[in-house]
């Protein structure tokens, strides 16, 4: 770590993927940056841990697809800088009924943005993917750019490069107080720091930090069951067999997504894009009825559509989502203190977009014009935003 005083150009709270990319962009631009993390690294308490995430350009909204174009470039740049593979192209298969409006919207977005994709009829699907069973006349959309990000490796690479660039990462330091002003003061369990600007990327702990600053965002913290299902024939749903990532759009009340067997030999990762509302400090409490219901939905999906997998998960892990009502991010400055920047509400789809999110948060913290239109991400879009203390 570089030797620094306790005064910084910027302090970033939260060393998940969004905070790491924010600190990365700050350090890249020769800013003195302190990245604070309440837990000792690595940890599995938040939203950025685990071996894999889906990367894709397939979105209903043009603005995400446009952001993803730059994200792919930055992910590739990070791979070169780290000297290690962080991404594998597998393609992404989106599944839905022929009438599904979401599938049509995504196809239109990919066409407008010039993204390589392919529409697959029911007949095409059965020929192309014999190890998937199609029971409802499903059609498919293949995002040729889709693939897998190696999440834990990416976090380690970023934290290492931040330090190489002169930034400082302090883990095991929980923030206990933020005093607004110029400079802003951040007090942790160990000491106090000051900076010209502060970026808060604290995931499910965001509102705990914001409440004393007079605002509360409409964030729902969800506990997600991350399930791994054993192949009956090893390798049949693996990366080596060119099996794609999958995203089921209307095969359950919420999306179901799957990643080819990779991190656990012979186990495919399949998850339900929903969970039950829990406090992040209580995520390890006994399972609720909602948990059981979520896993039952996945069991039915696997039994109906993936006959080459055992019908019950072999491994179940936990992850946290922090959702906004519209499932779009919050990237904005505090309405009263413009040197406090907030990145929150990544709603279970933020990891792949972190290279551009970090760039935007860096720009906001340095009072630079943002590279993208931030209208979809302003906190003012929520009428329920509490400003009781402003």
Curated annotation (Swiss-Prot):
One Gene Ontology CC term in the entry: peroxisome
Single biological process term from Gene Ontology: L-lysine catabolic process to acetyl-CoA via L-pipecolate
Pfam families tied to this protein: DAO (PF01266)
Single GO MF annotation: L-pipecolate oxidase activity
Residue numbers of N6-acetyllysine PTMs: 126, 287
InterPro entries per UniProt: FAD-dep_OxRdtase, FAD/NAD-bd_sf, MTOX
UniProt subcellular location: Peroxisome
Positions bound to FAD: 9-39
Main localization of the protein described in the UniProt heading: other
Catalytic activity: sarcosine + O2 + H2O = formaldehyde + glycine + H2O2; L-pipecolate + O2 = L-1-piperideine-6-carboxylate + H2O2 + H(+)
EC number: 1.5.3.1, 1.5.3.7
Keyword match Oxidoreductase: yes
SUPFAM superfamilies on file: FAD-linked reductases, C-terminal domain, FAD/NAD(P)-binding domain
PANTHER family to which the protein is assigned, alphabetical: PEROXISOMAL SARCOSINE OXIDASE (PTHR10961:SF46)
NCBIfam families: PRK11259.1 (NF008425), soxA_mon (TIGR01377)
Identification of the protein by name: Peroxisomal sarcosine oxidase
């Amino acid at each position: 770590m570089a030797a620094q005083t306790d005064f910084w150009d910027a302090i970033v709270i939260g060393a998940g993927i969004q905070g790491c990319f924010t600190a990365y962009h700050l350090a890249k631009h020769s800013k003195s940056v302190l990245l604070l993390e309440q837990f000792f690294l690595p940890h599995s308490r938040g939203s950025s841990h685990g071996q894999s995430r889906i990367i894709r350009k397939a979105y209903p909204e043009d603005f995400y697809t446009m952001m993803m174009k730059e994200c792919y470039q930055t992910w590739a740049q990070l791979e070169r800088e780290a000297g290690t593979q962080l991404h594998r192209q597998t393609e992404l298969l989106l599944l839905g009924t022929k009438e599904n409006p979401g599938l049509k919207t995504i196809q239109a977005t990919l066409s407008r943005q010039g993204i390589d994709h392919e529409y697959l009829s029911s007949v095409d699907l059965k020929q192309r993917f014999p190890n998937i069973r199609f029971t409802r006349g499903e059609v498919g959309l293949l995002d040729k750019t889709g693939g897998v990000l190696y999440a834990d490796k990416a976090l380690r690479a970023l934290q290492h490069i931040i330090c190489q660039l002169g930034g400082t990462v302090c883990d095991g330091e929980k923030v206990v107080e933020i005093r607004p002003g110029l400079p802003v003061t951040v007090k942790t369990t160990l000491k106090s720091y000051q900076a010209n600007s502060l970026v808060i990327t604290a995931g499910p702990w965001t509102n705990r930090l914001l409440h004393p600053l007079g605002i509360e965002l409409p964030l729902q913290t969800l506990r997600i069951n991350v399930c791994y299902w054993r192949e009956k024939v090893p390798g049949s749903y693996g990366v080596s067999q060119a099996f794609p990532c999958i995203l089921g759009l209307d095969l359950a009340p919420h999306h179901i997504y799957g990643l080819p067997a990779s991190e656990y030999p012979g186990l495919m990762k399949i998850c339900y894009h929903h969970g039950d509302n829990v406090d992040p400090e209580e995520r390890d409490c006994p399972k609720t009825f909602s948990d059981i219901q979520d896993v039952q939905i996945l069991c039915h999906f696997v039994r109906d559509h993936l006959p080459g997998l055992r019908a019950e998960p072999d491994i179940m892990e936990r992850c946290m989502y922090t959702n906004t009502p519209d499932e779009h991010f919050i990237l904005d400055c505090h309405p009263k203190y413009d040197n406090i920047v907030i990145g929150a509400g990544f709603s279970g789809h933020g990891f792949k977009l972190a290279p551009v999110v970090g760039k935007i948060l860096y720009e906001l913290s340095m009072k630079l014009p943002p590279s993208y239109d931030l209208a979809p991400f302003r906190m003012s879009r929520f009428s329920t935003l509490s400003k009781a203390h402003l």
